[in-house]
């Protein structure tokens, strides 16, 4: 299946449901498809991004060195561990907990940033926690010029190429 995500008549992204969920092309798509932590970052080099004051390995490449980017991390892709865990990338304090039926939704304050985290394990409000974000949980997007806006050239070119391919298939 192929999905086209549009905003006010403009194509934002074309792709499979999995591609759109896992690799949103802009802030609008990331918010449209589900809850996300969207953070400002700097792409240091291929496979390395800096956000929240530290460098994280990631699986993205093809960005310019030191390019400002938007970093998307889904709430279910963040692991909370003991604050003493030496593998923790970040440390924070649980500000609130909301039971959502199949999981808990936590708001965790990490310095000046509040992360939304989903987990099936309960942690009490006020608890200090460690945060682990693995490379494949980090999704990098080109920085939007304006909030929730994208240069539509890429999406339009993709749609045009798909339509041309369909016409060629019909001609053969």
Describe the function of each predicted region.
Residues 16, 25-26, 81, 119:
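Short beta-alpha junctions and helix-cap segments that line functional grooves
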Residues 12-13:
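Glutamine-centric residue-chemistry signal
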Residues 1-5, 16, 22:
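Conserved catalytic segment of ABC-fold P-loop ATPases
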Residues 22-43, 72:
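C-terminal boundary and immediately downstream tail of ABC-type ATPase nucleotide-binding domains
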